[in-house]
Amino acid sequence: MAQIDFSAEIRALRATYSSIENVSNVEELKEDIAELSERAGEPNLWDDPAAAQKITSRLSHRQSELERLNTLVSRIDDLEVLVELGQDEDDADSMGEAAAELESIRKSLKDLEVVTLLSGEFDEREAVVTIRAGAGGVDAADFAEMLLRMYLRWAERHGYPTTIMDTSYAEEAGLKSATFEVNAPYAYGTLSVEAGTHRLVRISPFDNQGRRQTSFAAVEVIPLIEQTDSIDIPDNEIRVDVFRSSGPGGQSVNTTDSAVRLTHIPTGTVVSMQNEKSQLQNRAAALRVLQSRLLLLKKEQEDAEKKAFAGDVKASWGDQMRSYVLNPYQMVKDLRTEHEVGNTSAVFDGEIDDFIDAGIRWRTDNRNAAN
C-alpha cells in the first residue's frame, strides 16, 4: 500500500468541508429549521393538509442537510483520532481502517458538494422519469427496458423509493415507453441531467445475421408537482381516452377499460397511465404527471424569454447526450462532459453516479458562463 500523508489529506478534507459549509450557509439552514419547526408545531397545521405536507417535507429535507454536515465533520474528527492512535501504536490494522475511511469521507464530501450545486427552482423536488424507445425497432424497445432497469437499480443503490406508473410493452420484446417516480429529495435536480437522447451500439440479439445495430431511446425528467402548486387545467382543455391495460407482447392484462390517456389540447402534451387497478386511480396519476409537465413547460418558456434578451434561446441538452457502445469495443461515453467508462455492465447495473456528477458540474459551469 502506498504511503498516505494523512495530515495533508485531513487538511484537504477540512478545506473541502469548509467550502461546502460556506455554500450551504449553515446559520441560514439552522434558522430555516427553527422557523419550519415552529410552524410544524402549530395546533391547526393540518387544517390545510397540502400546506402541512409541504412544511413537514421541507423541514425533513433541511434537517437531513444539517445532519449530513454534522455527521461529516464528526467523521473527519474521528478519522484524525484513529490516525493518531494507529501511528502511536504502529497498528497496521488501524491504519488500513483509516485509509478506507479516508476514501469513504472523500466520496461523501463529493456527493454533498454536488448537492450544493442543485440550486434550480425545482431541484429539491421528487422526479417523474419517462423513457421512450426511438429509432431502431425491437433493439430500441429492448434498449428502453435496459435504461429503465439501469435507473431503477441506481435508485435502489441509493435507497430511493420508486413507483412504476406506466409501462407500454412492445410486441416482440422490450418497452415502447415507461414512466416512474423517484420519491426522494433532489431527485429532479439530480436526474434532470439524464434527459436527452441515449444511443446504443451493439450486435443485435434479434438479428439472425448478427449485424451491428444502432438504436435510440429518449429520457424525459420532470419535477413532481406538489399539491400547493397553482396548476389548474380547465376540463375543456383535456381530452380523456380510456383503453385496456396491456402486457408483454401486446396481450391484455385487464378485462375492463382501466387505462387512461390524457391529452392537453392547447399544448398537445399526452400522458398515459395503466399500472393502477382502477380507471379513477390511473386518471388521478395521469393528471398529476400532466400538471408536472405543464409546470416545467411554463418554467422553460419563462427561461427562454429571459435568455432571448441575452441572445440565447437554446433550451435543450442536444439530441445525443450519451453513447453506450457494446461492439466492437465496450465504452459508455457522455458526449457533453466527455466522461467515459469501459465497464458497461456496471453502468447498466445502475453505477451512473460519476456520469450524473459530471453532468451537474457541466450544467453549473454552463449556467455560470451564461451569467
From Swiss-Prot:
Disulfide bonds: none annotated. Methylated by PrmC. Methylation increases the termination efficiency of RF2. InterPro entries: PCRF (IPR005139), Pep_chain_release_fac_I (IPR000352), Pep_chain_release_fac_I_sf (IPR045853), PrfB (IPR004374). PROSITE patterns: RF_PROK_I. It comes from the Bacteria. Pfam families: PCRF (PF03462), RF-1 (PF00472). GO terms for molecular function: translation release factor activity, codon specific. One of its GO terms (cellular component) is cytoplasm. Its main location: cytoplasm. SUPFAM superfamilies: Release factor (SSF75620). It is found in: Cytoplasm. Keywords: Cytoplasm, Methylation, Protein biosynthesis. The modification N5-methylglutamine is found at residue 251. HAMAP family: Rel_fac_2. PANTHER family: CLASS I PEPTIDE CHAIN RELEASE FACTOR, PEPTIDE CHAIN RELEASE FACTOR 2. Peptide chain release factor 2 directs the termination of translation in response to the peptide chain termination codons UGA and UAA. NCBIfam families: prfB. Belongs to the prokaryotic/mitochondrial release factor family. This is Peptide chain release factor 2. It comes from Arthrobacter sp. (strain FB24).
